[in-house]
Every structure is written in structure tokens, then in C-alpha cells.
Amino acid sequence: MVARVVWDHEAAGSSPVTSIPENHLETFVSGWSFCIIPHFLPRCIQIRAFAVQLFKYMFFYAAAMLPRCKACAPVYVVLHNLIMEAIPCRVAPAGYFSVVFSPQKRYNNLKFRNIREGIFMGKVRHCLRSAAGYLAVCAKWLVLAALVGCVVGPLGAAFGLALNWANATRAAQPWLLYLLPIAGLVIVFLYSHFDPDGGGSTNQVFVSVREHKPMTLRTAPLIFASTVMTHLFGGSSGREGAALLLGGSVSGQIGKVFHLENRDCRLMTMCGMAGAFSAIFGTPLAATIFTLEVVDVGSMQYAALLPCLVSALLGVFISGRMGLAPESFVLKAEVAATPLNLVRVILLGALLAALSIFFCELLHTAPKLYEKVFPTPYLRVVAGGVLIAALTTLLGTTDYNGAGAAVIEAAIDGEAIPYAFLLKMLFTALTLGAGFKGGEIVPIFFTGATFGCVAAPLLGLPPQLGASLGMVALFCGCTNSPLASICLAIEVFGGQCIALFALACAVSYMLSSYFSLYREQHFLHSKLRIVGVQRVHGRWSETDAKHFTTNDDGEN
């Protein structure tokens, strides 16, 4: 193997060892392109070419990193001597390298500077700028989410404490029930004058999230006052749905104060929903996942995961400090996940799915019947109040007025009246259909717990387990939020029999079809196959997967 050397400056009569020009880097390095080819490599063109290019770029990059000053001349001299010592070897021993020098076009110092700064430092600066921008956005949402949690948390806690006071006061003063029609007139008057377009429905917050339109601030005091009045005078409604409106309206206005874009206001609204739900019920994980998956079923906005979770955690922390205890139960009967028990749970989940369809349709039909019989909202709310007061007097119990938390606890302990779930559905439909305000989720818990307590022994399951499964699975079937339902089971029941809860929720979700508690809830994917769905003539039907697309907002 012969090494060949050709030096431009040797032809000019100068020695590279003893004479280093001022522009030494340009003279010594940039005039020559060299490569080292290991003899032990196989004679494969690709491998040899790769070795050539690798050493070539390594040398030029190392040379370019040296500063341009005369003090570095000895370094170049040493490098030159090392190379020159290798050149006289006409035949390289085994394992040695043959050095081949060939003249190429000159590389000036600007080229080296571009390699050093343009490639390396440029990439570093780009990475640092990208990381700084990314961290700035994360910090922004952490601060905003914390602010929302600190604002919505006390409001949610105050709302929950006010509802507890209202139910306790009504229980101590039964005569308040007969003032329910008058309370209904006040509620209709407030909404007709201060929020004629909103109506105080949970669907309002769904539209706000989907269309990037923050709700008005007056929604918060209206839903607060009207829901407390409904509970105080004996209406049958919940609180979580109202909490979604309360938190969503306040957090949306916070976004407007900071002049956020509509898309950012959407995320702020979701943070408020999670914070208020968590503050009321004490389940931050379920509140976060519920907010992400309930608006558009099949599409979760994971960008809202961290902000919503921060708001939810702060909400439950503040509400606990204010004295509002989180909901939690102890499951007194545990069942092993044997094949027979799994079949029993599947059957119970199917029954709960059918019940969820019936409950949703009942709540949607009641307002239509009221409108057909009573033409004005004032007549409707008075008629509803009279009907509820009459039924309560006829039954001789107030178990079906208000939220019914005591009945839920009794059902989870294994005691429930067989027809209690039917009466609760009737009372809730009469209350909300007439124009009274409140949520639907606690009545769902009541209905599911009492139904499960009655149906479980017929299937061979303990009534305590049946009530717990019914409470969670009916919530899943009505709201179409399976992940939030499983999280709810973990937080409320401490993770006991979680596999059975997950199975019941999955069955209820799949068999409940496209019925929903909320009219503004959209479905993006089929429950049975991996295809999209679209609304045709008011019904959700499957569409061809090839033609199914979603926009940036997750809508079809």
C-alpha cells in the first residue's frame, strides 16, 4: 500500500513544519481533504466509503473548533508531524492505516465557522428556543389552571354547602314543600329576564366548549340560586350538572379577562367544569376524565388533561378545607371474578343499559309533554310544583325529594324499596321538565343504586355489590363516559372489585346505543365497530370509515 502526498505550499518553497503562515488553519487544513482507510475492513465499497466520509468530517470539525490565533500554531505543527511520520510507510503493517492525501478545493474559515456555529450552535439555539417556548406554554396553563381551581373551588364548596343546608332545612320544615310552585315562579322569572337564551341547561356548557364561546357570567348566580331553591322547596334534582354550569361560566370569564383566544377560553371552560365537579363530589380523577370525554364521545382533548387535573385537585382540596366532605362508600360485599360471576355482571350491565335508555328518553319527553299541555313556562312550573307536592303527600315520604343521599347510602348497605328507582325517575322528570333547575347525575346515582340493589339478588349477586355496580354503570350508560365511570368507582369505592365495575360499565356503554342524557353530546365513533358516526334526521348512524374525517376540534 503506497501513500501519496502532494502539498501546494511545498511547491511554493515553504516547509509546513517550520513555517506556519498567519492564516495557518486555512493553509494547513483547508487545502487538503484526506481520509484514513482501515485495511482490515472488508473490501466493500459502501463500508469503505462510509469510513472515508466519517473520518473526513471528524477531522474538519475538530480543526474548525480550534480558535484562529497564532498561539495554536504548535498544535497544527504537531498534527502535521504525526501525519508526516505515517506517510513514509510504503507498506503498512497489518492493522495500520494508509493515509491518502489528494488536493481538493480549499475550505475557508467561513466554512468551518458555518460548520461549528451554523450546524451545531444553530441546532442548540433552535432546541433551546423550542424548549423555552414549550415550557412557557406549560407554565402558562399551570398558572391559569391553578387560578381557575382557586376561584371555582370555593364557589363549588359554597354551592355544595348551600345544597346541604337546603336539604337539611327542608327535612326540618316539611311545610316548605307546599311553597314549591311559588319558588318555580321565581325561577322562571329570573331566567326569562336575565338569561332568556341560556335556559340553565347543562347542554349550555357543552355548546360553549364545542363552539369556543364562553358563557355569560350571569349564568353562575342564576344556576346557584335556582338550584338551591329547587332543593330547598322539595324538587328532585342533583347538583353535579349545575356545578358544571357554575364552573364553566366563571372560568370562561376568567379567560376573557386575560384576553385569551376562543380556543384557549374553551380550555378554561373545561378547567372550570373539572374544578367545580371535583369540589362538589370530591373525585378529582373522575372529574378530569369526565370533562375530557363527555362533550365529544370518542375524542378526548389530551391537551386539557394537565390543566383540568390541576383545577380538579385544587377544587377538591379547597372544598375539603371549607368543610365539604367527599363522597365515599365502603363496599361490604366482595365477589371473586369467576366466570359465573362475570356472566352475572354482564347481565346486570345489560339491564342497566336498558334502564339508562328509558331514563334518558323520559327526561327528554317530559318537557315536551309539559309544553303540549301548558302553553307558558309559568303555568308549566306551577303545574310541576303542584304535582310534586301532591305525590309527596300521597306517598307520605320525602325520600324522593331533593338529592336523596340517604336512600343511596341505604341501597349500598343492601336495603332498597323495589319500586324506589321508578319513583325517583318520575319525580326527577316532573321537576326538570317543569322548569326547575339542578343536575341529573345524583338522581342517576339514586336510580342505579336502588335498581341494582333489587336486581342483583335475582341474578345471584349480593345486593350491596349490585347497588354499587348499578350506581356507576347507570351513570356510564346515561353520560356515555366509560373511563370517567371507572375512575369514579375507584375513587368512591376505593378500588374494590374494580374489574367487575369496569365490565359493568363497558357493557352498559356498548348496549346503551347512542342515547344520551345531554342533547348536545356528540358521538364521533361507533360503539360497535371502528367506524365513524354522523347524525341523520336526529339519529346517530354509522358512516363509511373511508369517508369519515375529523377537523381540528374533533368534530365530524
Set out the residue ranges of the language-model regions.
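Short, positively charged low-complexity motifs
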Residues: 1, 13, 26, 31-33, ...
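Intrinsically disordered, low-complexity segments enriched in serine/threonine/proline/glycine
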Residues: 18, 36-40, 53, 100
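Cationic, low-complexity basic patches in intrinsically disordered or flexible, solvent-exposed regions
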Residues: 54-57, 112
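Alpha-helical transmembrane segments and immediately membrane-proximal extracytoplasmic
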Residues: 95, 103, 107-556
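Intrinsically disordered, low-complexity cationic segments
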Residues: 8, 23, 38, 42, ...
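Extreme N-terminal basic, low-complexity initiation segments
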Residues: 2-9, 17
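Residues in intrinsically disordered, low-complexity segments of regulatory proteins
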Residues: 6, 31-34, 43, 140, ...
